[in-house]
Amino acid sequence: MSTSGTISNYYVDSLIMHENEDLLSSRYASGSLAQASRQAALTEHPDFSPCNFQSKATVFSTSWSPVHAQSSANMPTVYHPYMHQAPIAAAPDGRYMRSWLDPMPGTLSFPGLPSSRHYGIKPEPVASRRSDCTTFETHTLALSEYTCGTSPADKRVSEVSFSENNGETESNADKLHMDPNNPSANWLHARSTRKKRCPYTKHQTLELEKEFLFNMYLTRDRRYEVARVLNLTERQVKIWFQNRRMKMKKINKERPKDDR
């Protein structure tokens, strides 16, 4: 216990003494008091001769001078001083507004640049919503008309594609309606699957009738000549003569025996 108490007291005393010495040195550091104390010590001890110390050369030949801030006029034009930026304020709706979107003042003054030249920046209002923008209303209307409007060629192309799509949908609907397992649906939506007959004109029919009355059977050479004159194929001429002969046989069967 005694040893620890002695060490603690010594530690406290050393701290107190150092603090007192610092206070005294800071409080009585003036040159007049130091000279007075030195003269009193010399008078009290006359036996000792005063010591004269030779002055040593200073390490630095020139005296230190405080560094002065350079004026803005001497700075080059490329130098731009640091400008403090205002803190970003929160928007009313809780979002942060970016600083580079804020409108800049009309003229900017820089200390390093001559004041005679002004860099004008046109302020542009930043609209938060599209409904708030009133300055660009005419441009927006023009753009909307341009984007919404279509050229006549585009309209024709769209109409043609629309009609083709309608035709495809109708054909698909017909295919859906014609179900082989549902005969009633087939009967209601049935279409003629027979190939269309070749339409003969009145002039062609008249010439074929004349040729049939003259000769019911045609040779191959005569068939070729008739087809070339009437602008038909040999197959068409052959089929027409076959049908005409069948029709004539049917008429002959239906006649009574007395009329034969």
Swiss-Prot record:
Annotated Polar residues bias: 160-170
GO molecular function, one term: DNA-binding transcription factor activity, RNA polymerase II-specific
Gene Ontology terms: biological process: anterior/posterior pattern specification; DNA-templated transcription; embryonic skeletal system morphogenesis; proximal/distal pattern formation
Region (Disordered): 157-181
Main subcellular location: nucleus
Gene Ontology, cellular component aspect: nucleus
Keyword entries, A-Z: Developmental protein, DNA-binding, Homeobox, Nucleus, Transcription, Transcription regulation
DNA-binding interval(s): 193-252
Localization: Nucleus
Pfam families associated with the record: Homeodomain (PF00046), Hox9_act (PF04617)
PANTHER family: AGAP004664-PA (PTHR45970), HOMEOBOX PROTEIN HOX-A9 (PTHR45970:SF3)
Job description of the protein: Sequence-specific transcription factor which is part of a developmental regulatory system that provides cells with specific positional identities on the anterior-posterior axis.
Family the UniProt entry places it in: Belongs to the Abd-B homeobox family.
Protein name as catalogued: Homeobox protein Hox-A9
Naturally occurring in which organism (per UniProt): Heterodontus francisci (Horn shark)
